[in-house]
């Protein structure tokens, strides 16, 4: 009962928080039978909500034991299908209690149930997969061993990728990976239990890396982000991909990441050279306070039409924008203020924004609708008012983004007339970067000849 209610609320909250939710390979998930879902963990609270809401199975969740630190919390979380996991970093003395947690995992699988576990064990908020704990592999193998390897347990990896981990109305992609059949490791387990657990964990890690836009190390983060900034759209066009397609966007980021990782391993001096050129270019962008897209000739035609369309949109849409601000600004800004002043970790920001936002918007919408009813005593007016709240809020956000784009355009024109020499300098830097990228790309592609690289 409580699980079902929270599940419905979670789906609604997630749809309101994110602009676009892309779900891939959901058909892979079996409708019945024992399944262990494993996912990466960039966002401590949002990840289980998203995975649990869009997984086609009722789930149990293995969560850190510190969440169960009061009798009330324990009562609630237990009824939400949460199972405590005792971590060494929290309290080494309680590690022995994990026997009960593992036992619960066996029971779930033996009853053809499914549970979700985050094998990283921590949520850092970076695009780097942390060292995986072996719990998922151990539970799966030991459950099969206790039942003569007849349970037919599958481990299904889930890749969670956020376009922006902390921004409201950003995008998220959920990718289900190929099932890992635990029975396939029966011989390995009987030969050497520890090695079998490590083998399954290694396969899980490989799968999660394939399903996410993660780096092997955060030392190349600035390089990949720089390429995504100035070259991703051009590469997508060159590859015949759709710029607005989230899967194509993901694949392109993966291609760029793989290329950078190859260079870091084989020709690191090119990484150093590119980092220097990139930092000089980004410094000029910041100095002029403009975005890279305004320097991209490929977007010029689209931008010219976009300028006219934006002006018309800003004029025609201004009344609805004002209505959206009046009816949504207070519950929109309060969560941001609270999260900012409380200095939350980046991996927690979006989660707390979602929690506070859901509370404030619910209270504000109910209170304002009640007020309108009290003032008008008109059912039709009250219904129209309440129905307008969410769409007008979404429109206000979209409108404000267009205002920012237009301000950038005006600033670009101002720079063109007042700081032309500096603008030409930054354009020259950009051209040098693109030439360096093209040369590096061709050199990298030469190394891939004869190799079968699959990003789908």
What are these regions (language model features)?
Residues 2-5, 29-94, 331-346:
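Catalytic core of membrane glycerolipid acyltransferases/transacylases, capturing the structured
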Residues 13-33, 440-454:
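A short, well-structured juxtamembrane/interface segment
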Residues 19, 41, 95-99:
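A conditional alpha-helix N-cap/helix-loop micro-motif detector
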Residues 89, 94-300, 385-456:
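Non-catalytic C-terminal accessory region of glycerolipid acyltransferases
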Residues 284-310, 314, 318, 330-331:
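C-terminal non-catalytic accessory extensions
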Residues 303-308, 312, 335-359:
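Alpha-helical transmembrane segments with an aromatic anchor "belt"
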Residues 349-355, 359, 370-391:
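Hydrophobic alpha-helical transmembrane segments
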